[in-house]
C-alpha cells in the first residue's frame, strides 16, 4: 500500500534508476544490468521446463497425449493462432482470438527459412525474456532489493500456468507489453504507457486490467493538476493517455461487432466457445461438487491454485506499490476468476498475467541461502511443467 502523501512517494517519483550504473550495490558484475540476470534466470527455467516436458511426454498418463515436444508447442489454441497468422480469419468464429499475436507471428514468418511455428516460438521466447527483464526492473524499483527482484521473476517463470511460456500462446507477449506499460506508468511516461496499452488491447481481452491501471494513475494526476491550476504542459500527457489507452481493446471489440452485426459480438463469440464471464460460478460449482462427492485430483489441484492466487492477492494489497499496480493485479485476478464456465483448468494460465503476485513469496524466500533457492526453483519449474501437462491430459486445457 502506498504511504501517505504523494501517490508515487519514495523513490518511485524518480525515474527508474539505471541499475547497471550501481552494479556493486546490487552485487552484480560491472556493466551487467540486474534485469539481464532476471532474463537469464527465465531462460534457464524455460530450458528446464522443456527438458522436463520432453522426459515426461512418453511416460505414464502423459503418453495419452500422443504428441512430441514439437507437437506440444503448437497444440491446443496454438493451432488457432497459427491458422490466423497464415490465413487470416477464415471464419467469423475465429474473431474471438485477438489479432496482435498472430500478426507478430506473420511478420516474423516473412523472414526466409522461418516457419510459422518457429516464428510463433520466437515471438514467445523474445517476449518472455522482455517480460522477465521488465519484471526484474520493476521489482528493483519497488523493493530496492536484488534478491527479491530476481526471486519475483523466477517465481513468475515457474507459476502453475507457465507451460504456455514455452508454447505458441500469447501470454508471454501480453505480459511483456503489460509490464513495460506498468513501468512507464510508474515513471510517468504517459504516452509510452498509453501506446503499449493500445498494443496490449490487440493481444488479449485482459487488457482491461491495464486500461484500469492507466485510469487509476492518470485520473489523480489530472485532478491534482486542475486543483493546482497548473500549466497545460502538466496535464495534457495524462489526459491523452487516459483517452488513448482503451482504443486498442475498444477498437477490436468494435471491429468484431461490425463483422457479426451485434454490439456484443465479441462477447457472443466468446460464449460460443464455452467461455465468457460467469462471475465465478464455475469455481463455486466445482467447490460444491468437491465437497459433496469428493474432489478429483484435477479439481483439487486447480482449486488449490485458485485459493493460493486469492490469498496472494489479499497479501499483495499490504505491499507498498503505486495504486495503478494494485489496480492491475486486482483486475487481472478478478477477470481470471470470473471467466468460465467451461475451462476451469485454464484458470492457472489466466492468472499468469498477475505477475506481481510473486512479490510476497519472494520476500518470504529472500532469507534462504542460494544453495537452497536454486534447487527449490528447479523443482518448482519441473512441478509446474508436470502440472501443465497434467491439465492437458486430464483437464482438457493448458
Report each predicted region and the residues it spans:
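Membrane-lumen/periplasm interface segments of specific transmembrane helices
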Residues: 45-64, 73, 211-312, 321-329
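Short hydrophobic/aromatic helix or loop-helix immediately within or flanking a transmembrane segment
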Residues: 72-114, 279-285
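Loop-to-helix entry region of an early transmembrane alpha helix in multi-pass inner-membrane enzymes
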Residues: 99, 103, 113-130, 296-303
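Transmembrane-helix motifs of polytopic, lipid-linked glycan transferases
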Residues: 107, 119-142, 308-315
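Multi-pass, polyprenyl lipid-linked donor-dependent membrane glycosyltransferases
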Residues: 123-127, 146, 151-180, 200-210, ...
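Transmembrane-helix signature of polytopic, membrane-embedded enzymes
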Residues: 136-158, 192, 323, 327
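Membrane-interface transmembrane helices that cradle and orient dolichyl/undecaprenyl
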Residues: 181-192, 365
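Signature aromatic-anchored transmembrane alpha helix within multi-pass, membrane-resident enzymes
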Residues: 242-246, 367-397
Amino acid at each position: 500500500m502506498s504511504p501517505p502523501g504523494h501517490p508515487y512517494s519514495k523513490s518511485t517519483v524518480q525515474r527508474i534508476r539505471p541499475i547497471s550504473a550501481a552494479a556493486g550495490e546490487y552485487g552484480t558484475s560491472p556493466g551487467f544490468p540486474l534485469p539481464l540476470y532476471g532474463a537469464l534466470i527465465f531462460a534457464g527455467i524455460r530450458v528446464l521446463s522443456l527438458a522436463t516436458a520432453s522426459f515426461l511426454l512418453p511416460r505414464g498418463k502423459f503418453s495419452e497425449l500422443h504428441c512430441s515436444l514439437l507437437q506440444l508447442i503448437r497444440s491446443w489454441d496454438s493451432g488457432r493462432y497459427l491458422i490466423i497468422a497464415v490465413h487470416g480469419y477464415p471464419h467469423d468464429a475465429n474473431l474471438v482470438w485477438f489479432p496482435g499475436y498472430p500478426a507478430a507471428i506473420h511478420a516474423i514468418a516473412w523472414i526466409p527459412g522461418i516457419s510459422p511455428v518457429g516464428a510463433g516460438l520466437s515471438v514467445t521466447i523474445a517476449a518472455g525474456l522482455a517480460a522477465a527483464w521488465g519484471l526484474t526492473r520493476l521489482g528493483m524499483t519497488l523493493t530496492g532489493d536484488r534478491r527479491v527482484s530476481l526471486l519475483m521473476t523466477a517465481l513468475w517463470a515457474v507459476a502453475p500456468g507457465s507451460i504456455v511460456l514455452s508454447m505458441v500462446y500469447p501470454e508471454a507477449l501480453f505480459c511483456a507489453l503489460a509490464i513495460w506499460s506498468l513501468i512507464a506508468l510508474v515513471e510517468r511516461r504517459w504516452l509510452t504507457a498509453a501506446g503499449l496499452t493500445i498494443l496490449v488491447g490487440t493481444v488479449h481481452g485482459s487488457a482491461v486490467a491495464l486500461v484500469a491501471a492507466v485510469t487509476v494513475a492518470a485520473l489523480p494526476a489530472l485532478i491534482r493538476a486542475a486543483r493546482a491550476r497548473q500549466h497545460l504542459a502538466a496535464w495534457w500527457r495524462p489526459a491523452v493517455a487516459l483517452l488513448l489507452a482503451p482504443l486498442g481493446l475498444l477498437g477490436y471489440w468494435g471491429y468484431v461487432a461490425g463483422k457479426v452485426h451485434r454490439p456484443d459480438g465479441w462477447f457472443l463469440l466468446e460464449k460460443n466457445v464455452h467461455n465468457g464471464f460467469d462471475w465465478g460460478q464455475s469455481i463455486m460449482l466445482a467447490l460444491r461438487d468437491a465437497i459433496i462427492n469428493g474432489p478429483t485430483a484435477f479439481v483439487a489441484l486447480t482449486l488449490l491454485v485458485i485459493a493460493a492466487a486469492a490469498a496472494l492477492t489479499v497479501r499483495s494489497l499490504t505491499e507498498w506499490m503505486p495504486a495503478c499496480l494494485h489496480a492491475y493485479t486486482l483486475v487481472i485476478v478478478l477477470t481470471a476468476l470470473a471467466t468460465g464456465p467451461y475451462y476451469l483448468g485454464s484458470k492457472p494460465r489466466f492468472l499468469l498475467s498477475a505477475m506481481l503476485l510473486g512479490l510476497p513469496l519472494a520476500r518470504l524466500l529472500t532469507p534462504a541461502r542460494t544453495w537452497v533457492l536454486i534447487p527449490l526453483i528447479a523443482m518448482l519449474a519441473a512441478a509446474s511443467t508436470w502440472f501443465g501437462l497434467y491439465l492437458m491430459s486430464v483437464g482438457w486445457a493448458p
